[in-house]
Structure formats: structure tokens, C-alpha cells
């Protein structure tokens, strides 16, 4: 049985988005391994405290990630 662990910075994704992640990740596993995997696929979402995550050696806060998302969406 697969266990898929997703780590996110807290506050970046809302509950609806996280639920969609779980559904989509499960569907991806089923697409790869077949329908019998649906009932045995575990998806765990762990939220990492803002500022306890780093990119390129620099800590990231929730606000930093939201600013990156806004820039990407504006492009």
C-alpha cells in the first residue's frame, strides 16, 4: 500500500485545495497501478510552520510563497 506524504508551508493552501490534492494524488496512483490501489492509497498532508522551510538557503514564510504565487498568476 502506498503512503504519499505531501509537505506544505502552513497557510498557503486552503482546505478545499488540500482536499483536491488528496483526490488528484489518489487518482494519479490509480491511473498508474490500477483501481485496486484506490482503497489502499494513503495520502498524508503535513503543514510545515511558516519560516521553517527554505529555498536556495533562505527561509520562506507563508507571505513569501503567496507573493510568488501572485507573480506567477500575473504572468
Residue ranges of model-derived segments:
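A domain-level signal for the structural core that forms small-molecule/cofactor-binding pockets
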Residues: 2-75
Amino acid at each position: 500500500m502506498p503512503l504519499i506524504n505531501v509537505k506544505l508551508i502552513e497557510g498557503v493552501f486552503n482546505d478545499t485545495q488540500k482536499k483536491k490534492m488528496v483526490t488528484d494524488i489518489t487518482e494519479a496512483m490509480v491511473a498508474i497501478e490500477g483501481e485496486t490501489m484506490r482503497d489502499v492509497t494513503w495520502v498524508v498532508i503535513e503543514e510545515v510552520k511558516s519560516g521553517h522551510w527554505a529555498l536556495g538557503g533562505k527561509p520562506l514564510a507563508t507571505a513569501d510563497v503567496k507573493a510568488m504565487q501572485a507573480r506567477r498568476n500575473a504572468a
